[in-house]
Curated annotation (Swiss-Prot):
Keywords: Aminoacyl-tRNA synthetase, ATP-binding, Cytoplasm, Ligase, Nucleotide-binding, Protein biosynthesis. One of its GO terms (molecular function) is aminoacyl-tRNA deacylase activity. It comes from the Archaea. A motif ('KMSKS' region) lies at residues 697-701. It is found in: Cytoplasm. It comes from Ignicoccus hospitalis (strain KIN4/I / DSM 18386 / JCM 14125). InterPro entries: aa-tRNA-synth_Ia (IPR002300), Leu-tRNA-lgase_arc (IPR020791), Leu-tRNA-synth_Ia_arc/euk (IPR004493), M/V/L/I-tRNA-synth_anticd-bd (IPR013155), Methionyl/Leucyl_tRNA_Synth (IPR015413), Rossmann-like_a/b/a_fold (IPR014729), tRNAsynth_Ia_anticodon-bd (IPR009080), Val/Leu/Ile-tRNA-synth_edit (IPR009008). Its EC number is 6.1.1.4. A motif ('HIGH' region) lies at residues 47-57. One of its GO terms (cellular component) is cytoplasm. This is Leucine--tRNA ligase.
Amino acid sequence: MGDFVEDFVRYLKEIAAKWREEWERARLHEADVDPNRPKFYVTAAFPYPNSPMHLGHSRTYSVTDAYARFKRMRGFNVLFPMGFHYTGTPIIAMSEKVKQGLQALRSLGEVKTILEEIWKIKVERNLSIGEAIKEYLRGAGREDLMDKTDSIEYLVLFYKVFEIPVEDLEKLTEPLSMANYFASITEEGMKELGYMIDWRRKFTTVDPDFQKFITWQFLKLYDLGYVEKGTHPVAWDPVYDTPVSQHDTKGDVEPEIEEYDVILFKLKDEDLYLPAATLRAETVFGVTNVWLNPEAEYEVVEVDGKRWVLSKKAAYKIKFQKDEVKSLGPIDPKKLLKKMVINPATEEEVPVLPARFVDPNVATGVVMSVPAHAPFDYVALKELEGDPEYSDIVKSIELVQVIRVPEEGLLVPQLVEKLGIRDTSDKKKLEEATREVYSKEYRKGRMLESVLERVKGDERLRAALKAFLGNDPVPDAREKTAKWLKLFGAGDVFYEIKNAPVYSRFGNEVVVKVLKDQWFLNYGDPQWKELARKALARMRIIPENFLKEFEDTIDWLQKRACARTRGLGTPLPWDKRWIIESLSDSTIYMAFYTVVNILRGASVEPEKLQPEVWDYIMLGKGNPKELEEKYGISAAVLEEARRSFDYWYPVDSRHSGKDLIRNHLTFFIFNHAAIFPEDKWPRQIVVNGFVNLEGKKMSKSLGNIIPITVAIRSFAPDIIRLVLLHSAELGSDADFRTEMVSRAISNLREIKSIVEKVKDYNGPRPANLTMLDAWYLSSFVKDVENVTNMMEDLKIREVTNVLYFILLNRTKEYLNALEAMGRGLDEVAKWVLRYTVERWVKMMTPFTPFFAEEMWHELGFNTFVVTEPWPVKDEELVNPLAEAAKEYVEKVIEDIKEIIKVAKIEKPKKVRIEVASPEQVKMLKMAVEFVNSGKSLREFMAEATKVFGKKEAKSLRQAFERATSLSESMRSVIARGEFDEKAVLEEFKRLIEEEVGSEVEIRRYEGGKKRPEPLRPAIYVE
């Protein structure tokens, strides 16, 4: 950055520090109940303090703060609170990693020196942090510490990226100490960014009073029947023996559980089963063979008394899903090839064949082959046909069609040929074909009755199956087939992590465990789902395109484990061995913000906050006098808390990242719908995308994370806010780029210089405005209206584009035109600019609040700008004629320049402009009237030729075509007969001369060879 840029950034940081101090001294961001003002309650997802806040976190909070400031200036009493989420395993896992990392480094030498050396290797060799650590360990001859790479990586990140002093790293080895340390850094970062947060309401989820609130919530859910104990598959950390959800995993990945149907194919003449895992049980009637991967490791495992052949990974996973599991040792898959197995559905014998496309890490590692309905199977068989060892077997295999799709033949052979798939190495095309086949068959397919003839046994069985399955839609047939196979012991289930591999915060790969005696929130309860749908239907989702994802999530959500055996948080009230997990204690905490400052201000002891107390505060049930007698809490305090909750609730706008739609945000809807009356249900959810850095995803391994403290020191708070808010539309991912930082700095400097031009001006409103002044003001008051409407819809990128780019460029254009026309900043122009700047500064407040505050005071005001009313559109200043005139003049200047360029005239002496005759103007006026009333060219010509004669048919047709292409403002002034081309050009003559570098003469057409059209003057350049 150049000196002037550095000076301006220093200035921005200085004014940010100054105004932060002033705001805090004035307690500007504190919000209390005010019955005389409408309220607006806005919340954003509270952060996990398991690391310092960085740029990626700050987008959600910057959007929320901009919206909160806007609503405050629109006359609302706005509350924006913040707390910290300590619940669950993330903080414990991180503190353990730090402890392990420090132990490893201390065994090598001095911690600081080693961290510096690792960073040097990373930078010099352009490696990831993890690769640099491994290089260092190899060089030190300490390969035995390779398994501690992940732990050391966090230390490098904290020390070099987050700039945490080495002496403070020890503080991070104890969970609560770490949480408090990072929470204080995050709070400071939020204050430095100017967020309008009422910090009196801060709490953590391990605070005793909050835990009493969560206890009340869960007792309510239990009484409603939404908390159940039972058996259910859950994502599981196999080392720490605890369920995991999104907040418990590395990268905040939600483990998705997928249920496979298992179909048991018994080896002929052997007590051994090949358990084929499938998502398409209905196709079992068309199985031609079973696949094993000859390169994979397999084991024999006794499952519920039967000997299953499973991949090594599946043999490990099955132990978490079944009670009766016994490992019987490895088995060579090659020894099973060519053997025959029995299809349990048809009792047909089919061969076991090799396929390297079978992934031993997915489900059982055994796949049934249905080539008529699976592109991979079809192509693999074609491939195997060329292998002499298997050629005869494959040639004897015939495709068996199980499903028919109306007006389609067998889809698989058609698609394989269409896509030009040659072999199984063409995975992308095979996956594309698979998706298309599965989709069409699922949506349109029906079971063929004829395929059920393959079932062995008596005719009665086949008849029963035809009645049971024949002609069924695929989804029904799938479910029925799986149930039928399970009924006689030939079917089972296997659960898999669909988006594997997913790792817990402790670094262990997550598996699926079928958990018994586990506590669940039953989001599958039909009554609860209906309430959630009702609540969602009444809400506004921004951006609207995310609504379907909410609807889909409500539909597929089922039971969800709500408690853990490990982690920070609130014990389950009726079974204190369990801790309520992080996505279950973060659904209605927004209600706690509304009263926490009152209860703590009155020094209410947490033990007194029994369920009856919360019933009164949150639901208005009970008598405060009786509660005072019973629990010793002042009735006045209880009544104040009740009034506060009743005033602030419901949440008017909830803000979060789009990754939380499928869990937290939907749980937020469910829990509010269950516990609170309808008038307290949330009104709006706002979702935003993520933040990239210079086009790349921010990653701890790459070390390309910018902590907020570092960003503020480098760029200043207002610049960070503006770049984050301007770089993408709400639902898209933002990109924090140095180029955009430079533009933001440059534009704020220019805006400051504009403000300084009129900071001391306080003259009266002029009696008359020129066309130029009127154009500028008319455009501006329209901006006010557009910006206001866009902010209501949170189209923040469009708003910042208007305020910091379009309006700035238009203002510069206005100032340049003033100079060109010889006016300079005269008294009228000063008033125009002052009028604009005052309102412009107000509208910048949500986005660059420190800069706006400084500019507001530069203009001579002594109030805080956020307490000022938002600008409103001044209808008196709307001037379509001035806008049309400026539009017209710009086009004329553009045409003149083009003529000069084409004619290659270096120094034009004179430009003559001839405008259309009055009669032609009348033609255009009539054409505009017809266009405005929706009439056709034919209707226009029929009437116009009566007025102007048939000889003018060509001109009339041109006039009509011209009328259809005009802007709305131009059409309106033409229709009113207000637009005089010659007068407009005369008024802007000096500007035109300055722009084209020549003397300009303007006159009306009085005859001649080149006849000008209305708004298309004839131009002659000498």
